[in-house]
């Protein structure tokens, strides 16, 4: 079976899985509104097809979350008609991803971080990884890398830290990822990890192997 046929089949499977999670496009945006692109693609690994997700390591010169791992994305511009437009624009600006290479599958309910920023996860599928010519914006992105989506359901290379906010105790999840040559390591945590746990749970139709206990403010209506 060709890679094109396999990708097409995987895309149709993903569309079906996310149908029940589809949200209505937001007509009114909170003052603090942003979107991130959860860009999935399929790759042959160890005789099986594996879904992977594209991530970035933020520049250490940024004033906000320097050096942390994040999904491509950012704040909404007034010209953005919806969350999809925001996510695709930011992905182009940050990592050079051509929007024409991505098929949008779904937009999930927004998460809300501790500072009140609404973050809408936009789920996309990259058909041709080789056509994606990585072009990290040095002002924003230090590195582009990818990880297997399923790792966010496993208890391997994971730890949790208890935090408290307005009397509520919750857990922040930390996932350690090591490059294949073992020379680089990344920590994927907090809201980024929470979004990817949610996406992986939908795709693989199962709960994580660990206790999640996420903060309730992540899912406040806005």
From Swiss-Prot:
Binding site residues for Mg(2+): 90, 94
GO function term, MF aspect, one: coenzyme A diphosphatase activity
Keyword Transmembrane found: yes
Tissues in which the UniProt entry reports expression: Expressed in roots, stems and leaves.
Enzyme Commission numbers on file: 3.6.1.-
GO biological process: coenzyme A biosynthetic process; malonyl-CoA catabolic process; nucleoside phosphate metabolic process
Subcellular compartments: Peroxisome membrane
Cofactor(s) essential for the protein: Mn(2+); Mg(2+)
This protein's UniProt keywords: Hydrolase, Magnesium, Manganese, Membrane, Metal-binding, Peroxisome, Transmembrane, Transmembrane helix
CDD domains in the cross-refs: NUDIX_CoAse_Nudt7
All residue ranges annotated as the Nudix hydrolase domain in the record: 31-175
PANTHER family xrefs: NUDIX HYDROLASE, NUDIX HYDROLASE 11
Function summary: Coenzyme A diphosphatase which mediates the cleavage of CoA into 3',5'-ADP from CoA and 4'-phosphopantetheine. Can use malonyl-CoA, hexanoyl-CoA, lauroyl-CoA, myristoyl-CoA and palmitoyl-CoA as substrates, but not isobutyryl-CoA or propionyl-CoA.
Homology family: Belongs to the Nudix hydrolase family. PCD1 subfamily.
Annotated protein name in UniProt: Nudix hydrolase 11
Biological classification of the source: Eukaryota, Viridiplantae, Streptophyta, Embryophyta, Tracheophyta
Primary gene name: NUDT11
